[in-house]
Amino acid sequence: MGMSLESMAIEMPKVFGHPNRVGFRGVLTVVDAASDKAPAGARGHRVLLTRAAAEEAIPSLLGMALDYSPRLDGHDTRRKIGVITRAEIVGREVTVAGFLYGRDFPEMVAEIGKNPTHSQRARMNGVSGNPKHAGEGIPAAEAGLGMSYEIADAVVEDIKANVWILNQLTFTGAAVLRRNKAAYKSTWIELG
């Protein structure tokens, strides 16, 4: 099985120790797989982002904002905490990276910093049984923070279908939210 990689980035000048530029990276979504639940705006339908649509839309992610809602349970496009400077498709994952406004939003940097890293999550999920995240009663795969994309100009193959297949879209941003609130539970975000 071969790995496919499509990548784009905005080259940011290196500024050592910049107080308002804290790096982040993570998985925004997956391609060619139905969402675990219906995202906001999909009228109760699960969605499937096709690889072709994602490849075409990757450039629209660059320079878009990363936002959050105070309860980390949805989107709030007026609370912009960072910017996406890199987006790529690795296998079936749409990965992103960029910068958080660390000086402006130290509480969000701290919250994301508490999130288990990708390798820690893999170890938690590798334990036999159904591991729980510390005291929350949530399976480790759903614990912590994830991400969700924001889009416009979506073309849905069949709006009567149970799963909406997205064949075209424009990314307009992304949100940080609790993984158990995300449409795709395999999303994640970490500092780095």
Indicate residue ranges for each PLM-predicted region:
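Short, surface-exposed beta-strand/loop "edge" segments at domain boundaries and coil↔beta transitions
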Residues: 23, 29-40, 56, 72-76, ...
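Short secondary-structure capping micro-motifs at structural edges
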Residues: 69-72, 79-85, 134-136
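Short amphipathic beta-strand and strand-loop transition segments with alternating hydrophobic
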Residues: 7-17, 78-89, 155
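Residue microenvironments linked to proteolytic maturation
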Residues: 86-192
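A broad, low-specificity signal marking well-ordered, structured residues that form hydrophobic/aromatic
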Residues: 22-26, 64-66, 94, 147, ...
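Polar/acidic, low-complexity leader/linker segments enriched in S/T/G and N/D
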Residues: 1-62
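A structural detector for beta-sheet-dominated domains
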Residues: 6, 13, 31, 62, ...
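Short conserved beta-strand and strand-loop elements enriched in small hydrophobics
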Residues: 60-75, 147
